[in-house]
Amino acid sequence: MPKIANSGDGSGLMRTPEVAGKIVTAVKQAVSVPVTVKCRLGWDKGSINVLDFTKRMEDCGADMITVHGRTRSMLYSGTADWEMIRKVKAQCRVPVIANGDIVDGPSAVRCLHWTGADGLMIGRATFGDPWVFTEVRAALKGEPVPPRPPLAARVDTA
């Protein structure tokens, strides 16, 4: 969301990792539930700082980190960089969740295999297609994909 990011919040915190770290530390001290962080690769291709950022978040107490494999300036264009997610996973002790370009069962399997992530976050692929979760679950278990509901059921869901 441009209004949020441009005011220094959301993905805008990638530009001020020290502030993001202070937020994680404060939240961690204030709550008794796990504290998670979601970030992108960086603000733009000239400021990719996800490795330093996620290390700092982990050091400040984050219990899990989700990485969207694009920069803020990419928004949802281009291809998610699963290699960078793999690098984050390699350096983190906390669970890492991969996000970006997971659109169906086969892409979910490829993403987990490539990144070594502990889990997946599916975003835009769910818009108008909540059955994608059934497809992904089947693919991850190596099972056949169940048929989609009949058109009438899909229309009712919409």
Task: Give, region by region, the residue ranges found by the protein language model.
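Active-site beta->alpha loop and helix N-cap motifs at the rims of alpha/beta catalytic domains
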Residues: 1-35, 40-48, 58
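Glycine- and other small-residue-rich loops at beta-strand/loop junctions that grip anionic moieties
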Residues: 12-16, 38, 74-77, 97-101, ...
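Alpha/beta catalytic cores of nucleotide-metabolism and tRNA/nucleoside-modifying enzymes
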Residues: 22-25, 30-32, 46-64, 83-98, ...
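Glycine-rich tight-turn/loop motif centered on a GG-T
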Residues: 2-19, 70-82, 141-145
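Active-site-proximal loop/turn and secondary-structure-junction residues that shape catalytic pockets
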Residues: 1, 35, 39-45, 69-73, ...
